[in-house]
């Protein structure tokens, strides 16, 4: 018998013992009867022995309380071990009841413990004293801060200055709560980080399908194709990585496209390292291979592509037969040969052919993914995701087992207790007329848009967002904050200190993962689940019979949560209900009283989550108790091909069918408890809503696009000024080799590290010890040419200025390209506030438009309530490169195109590691240059509206607000 077999036999009684008591055994990954987690039946009193007390037997009794990690978008389940005596959190582990993460976590999950015990965290509301940017604050009460903020908002609303109110979100971590708050206020004030994150990726999927995110069924795939580093970072790293690994164990092949040798690439069967921005050329070469060789799913293309619309628009004189379309398809893509793709990418024809042949073997079990990566880095990056999905669309691998689904079908957003009407106004600071097809708000250009439009903000919130650090051109943001005529009151809602908060008027402490309420659902497999984040000490006290009315009562200091804060703030904005706001924050159970989070989520779980009542009843619980007990619920184990479902007869009333098979009905849309957003195609001329498509003699559900089918041909792009991009094509990036002068090279700055959290992990000692700096990746060929060795200081010169960084000479980056990771180069402007373990102290110097960030004091050990801070050994915290980047808005998607054209030189005398220089006058020149590529709605709108109304848009205003204003 093998060692594993012997061990299994020895401990088998442990499993039998658990199951004999009628308790749940959670199988460990070893598959040898070791349990991964305590049985859920013992979560009220789990006993562990203190390992440090051995050989004495010292017991620790814990309550295991579920919550959800807030340290990336994956929203993995956590179990907090709450000490029954002290009611403090001892540790965090995975939650085996969470369908997405299935009990597993990356390093960021357990590191939540560092965040809640961080000695430098913000514990009380703070108000600025002295000028903005002085970094001087005093403690104030929540009452004082909330009253001041509410009075400003109330005055702006009553004076019809609704567009001067804005909430700018970083990591949302929730589904729709903040949007509903803004809708209740009647303001178009939602801003997000999406255009520095994923708008490029979203656009490509949206124009195909009417849904803006992929949902790959990795676990069942035969071939997995990643333009990402998905085994180590990204959306949704941990849940996806474990399923990719399972597929590979069953024989699936993994193709990774990444200019960098990422950890993911090291696991690939095929790693392709293309020139940055050439990825769409590669994808289209694979498409061309399938097309020219007839290796695509003809029946799927015939049924589900809008090829008839393509023929009518571009070849009106031809007989619109499928055979003629097939011939045209061959002609359209004939130029995307392996020879062409090899020239663009630098990947050999042989490797491209090998990859195409492998893809062709997948059939409908082809899972692909692109989210940020190349789609976020390049001008025209949205064609990367559009072309990768074209491979799926050719193979018919759309919502199939092992194929790529669409996120709205694998996501569950329960309808809340109130749904306020959407605003009647349009905010041009977020949605400027120059970018009618932008997928999301042009958030990263806010300082430039203020100058461009002459508009201002009375109250500006950031919520877990750090624009001075995260966005390009951070010094322009600092200039905006320093001008009180542009921003009347800036409120930073944040659990941690960040660079932007130093310029705030109020810094208000918000909770971490275990200190707040949220619901969320993400597409991680072909099913649907709902997660519930909760304050774990509150839940623990309630298990012990104590009622908690306010989360501040159980959080450290006076740390609050956005849910309760926004309810309270809304009552202060509209104390008597005369503005029509308070009604959306009143209790239904007790009219006239303030809505509580308990009632908000109880109503949701009771009324909007199919199957939850029954599951709870089976355990003698109500739905709210069930979610507090387990932290997650699987709504559906499998969804399948939604687009191929027949439309029920009761939805077919007085139907009309368009020449291309789009079916319209007068029957009202059935109410759904799932309010996940999708595309919203327009009704027909007589007001019938689109309900499906004709597929043979059946009416099937189809896709939420104008045609109801997958839109190979986008009438939206064609009629809104971009005819040349009506079908998937290749756009040369702004870092294309032909556009580089001698000595210039692309800088890749978008990649993330597995153990860092954007800019929210400077307060996590375990993560910071593992990764705390960001050297410049440079190939030995380039390093030898320049005479550079490991650790040498380099100047990286950009359009705006330069930053000084250490060299890392590695074959992990292709020659002619350099790379520098996200997260690092954190700084603070004094020693009074900030995360001392990862933020160096700097001096900011301004001379007109010229700014210097000069390091003045490094990271060093210090004494605090945590003895580990005296053991800090690292001093190098990297460089803040984003400050030196100009804004690069893609003229179609609106995405900031992150890749930079740079000149790398040896550092000059006096240069210091981490030093940054920027001239914001040059940033204005870059803004104007990129704005020249835009095609404003005034020039291209076919119907005198600002934007196609069917496209997804957060907080979508009323139809009247879409009308273009007079140009006068």
Model-assigned labels for residue ranges:
Residues 1-296, 348, 461-463, 507, ...:
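N-terminal export/assembly segments and adjacent metallocofactor-ligating motifs
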Residues 178-245, 250-255, 281, 388-506, ...:
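Extended redox/cofactor-interaction regions of prokaryotic respiratory oxidoreductases
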Residues 251, 255, 260-363:
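Long, well-ordered, tryptophan-enriched scaffold segments
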Residues 535-632, 636-637, 641, 649, ...:
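Long, C-terminal catalytic modules of enzymes
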Residues 790-801:
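Short conserved beta-strand and strand-loop elements enriched in small hydrophobics
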Residues 805-809:
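Short beta-strand-centered aromatic/proline hotspots
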Residues 811-824:
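Short, solvent-exposed secondary-structure boundary/capping segments
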């Amino acid at each position: 018998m093998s060692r594993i077999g012997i061990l299994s036999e020895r401990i088998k009684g442990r499993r039998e013992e658990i199951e004999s008591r009628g308790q749940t055994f959670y199988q460990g990954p070893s598959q040898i009867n070791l349990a991964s987690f305590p049985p859920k039946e013992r979560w009220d009193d789990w006993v562990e022995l203190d390992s440090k007390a051995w050989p004495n037997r010292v017991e620790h009794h814990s309550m295991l309380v579920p919550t959800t990690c807030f340290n990336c978008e994956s929203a993995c389940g956590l179990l907090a071990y709450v000490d029954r005596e002290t009611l403090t959190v001892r540790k965090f582990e995975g939650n085996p009841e969470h369908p997405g993460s299935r009990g597993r976590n990356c390093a960021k999950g357990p590191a939540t413990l560092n965040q809640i015990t961080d000695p430098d965290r913000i514990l009380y509301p703070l108000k600025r004293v002295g000028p903005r940017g002085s970094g001087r604050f005093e403690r104030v009460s929540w009452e004082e801060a909330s009253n001041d903020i509410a009075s400003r908002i109330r005055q702006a609303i009553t004076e019809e200055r609704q567009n001067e109110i804005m909430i700018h979100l970083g990591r949302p971590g929730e589904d729709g709560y903040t949007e509903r708050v803004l809708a209740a206020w009647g303001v178009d004030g939602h801003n997000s980080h999406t255009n520095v994150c994923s708008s490029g990726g979203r656009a490509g999927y949206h124009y195909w399908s009417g849904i803006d995110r992929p949902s790959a069924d990795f676990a069942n795939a035969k071939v997995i194709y990643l333009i990402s580093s998905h085994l180590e970072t990204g959306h949704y790293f941990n849940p996806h990585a474990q399923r990719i690994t399972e597929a590979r164990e069953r024989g699936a092949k993994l193709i990774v496209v990444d200019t960098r040798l990422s950890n993911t690439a090291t696991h690939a069967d095929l790693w392709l390292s293309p020139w940055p921005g050439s990825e769409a050329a590669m994808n289209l070469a694979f498409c061309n291979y399938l097309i020219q060789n007839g290796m695509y799913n003809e029946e799927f293309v015939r049924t589900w592509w809008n090829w008839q619309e393509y023929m009518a628009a571009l070849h009106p004189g031809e007989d619109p037969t499928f055979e003629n379309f097939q011939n045209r398809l061959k002609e359209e893509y004939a130029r995307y040969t392996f020879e062409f793709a090899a020239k663009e990418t630098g990947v050999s024809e042989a490797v491209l052919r090998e990859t195409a042949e492998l893809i062709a073997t997948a059939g409908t079990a082809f899972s692909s993914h692109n989210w940020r990566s190349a789609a976020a880095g390049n001008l025209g990056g949205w064609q990367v995701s559009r072309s990768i999905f074209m491979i799926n669309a050719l193979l018919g691998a759309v919502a199939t087992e092992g194929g790529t689904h669409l996120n709205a079908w694998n996501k569950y957003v329960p309808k809340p207790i109130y749904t306020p009407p959407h605003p009647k106004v349009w905010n041009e600071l977020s949605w400027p007329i120059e970018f009618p097809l932008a997928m999301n708000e042009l958030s990263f250009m806010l300082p430039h848009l203020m100058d461009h439009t002459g508009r201002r903000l009375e109250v500006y919130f950031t919520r877990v967002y750090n624009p001075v650090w995260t966005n390009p051109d951070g010094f322009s943001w600092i200039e905006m904050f320093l001008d009180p005529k542009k921003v009347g009151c800036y409120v930073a809602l944040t659990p941690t200190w960040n660079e932007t908060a130093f310029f705030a008027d109020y810094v208000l402490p918000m909770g971490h993962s275990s200190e707040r309420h949220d619901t969320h659902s993400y597409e991680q497999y072909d099913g649907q689940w709902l997660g519930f984040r909760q304050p774990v000490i509150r839940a623990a006290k309630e298990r012990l019979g104590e009622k908690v009315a306010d989360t501040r009562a159980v959080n450290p200091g006076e740390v609050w949560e956005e849910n309760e804060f926004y309810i309270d703030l809304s009552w202060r904005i509209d104390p008597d209900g005369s503005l029509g706001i308070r009604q959306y924050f009143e209790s239904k159970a007790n009219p006239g009283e303030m809505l509580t989070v308990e009632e908000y989520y109880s109503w949701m779980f009771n009324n909007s989550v199919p199957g939850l009542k029954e599951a709870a009843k089976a355990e003698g619980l109500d739905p709210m108790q069930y979610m507090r007990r387990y932290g997650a619920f699987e709504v559906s184990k499998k969804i399948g091909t939604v687009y191929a479902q027949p439309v029920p007869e009761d939805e077919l009333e007085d139907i009309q069918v368009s020449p291309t098979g789009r079916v319209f009905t007068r029957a009202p849309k059935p109410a759904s408890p799932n309010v996940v957003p999708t595309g919203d195609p327009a009704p027909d001329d007589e007001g019938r809503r689109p309900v499906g498509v004709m597929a043979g003699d059946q009416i099937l559900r189809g896709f939420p696009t104008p045609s109801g089918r997958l839109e190979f041909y986008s009438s939206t792009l064609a009629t809104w000024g971009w005819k040349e991009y009506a079908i998937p094509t290749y756009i040369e990036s702004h870092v294309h080799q032909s556009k580089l002068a001698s000595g210039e090279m692309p800088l890749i700055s978008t990649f993330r590290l597995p153990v860092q959290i954007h800019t929210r992990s400077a307060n996590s000692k375990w993560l910071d010890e593992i990764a705390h700096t960001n050297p410049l990746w440079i190939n030995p060929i380039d390093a030898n040419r320049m005479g550079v060795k490991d650790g040498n200081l380099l100047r990286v010169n950009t359009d705006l200025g330069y930053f000084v960084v250490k060299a890392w000479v590695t074959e992990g980056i292709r020659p002619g390209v350099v790379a520098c990771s996200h997260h690092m180069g954190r700084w603070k402007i004094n020693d009074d506030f900030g995360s001392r373990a990862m933020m160096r102290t700097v001096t900011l110097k301004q001379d007109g438009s010229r700014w210097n960030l000069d390091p003045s004091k490094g990271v060093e050990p210090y004494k605090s309530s945590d003895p580990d801070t005296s053991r800090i050994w690292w001093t190098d915290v990297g460089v803040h490169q984003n400050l030196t980047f100009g804004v690069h808005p893609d003229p179609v998607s609106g995405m900031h195109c992150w890749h930079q054209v740079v000149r790398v030189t040896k550092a000059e005398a006096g240069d210091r590691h981490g030093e940054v220089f920027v001239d914001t006058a040059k940033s204005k020149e870059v803004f104007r240059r990129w704005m020249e590529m835009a095609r404003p709605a005034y020039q291209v709108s076919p119907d005198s509206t600002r934007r196609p109304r069917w496209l997804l848009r957060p907080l979508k205003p009323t139809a009247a607000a879409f009308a273009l204003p007079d140009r006068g």
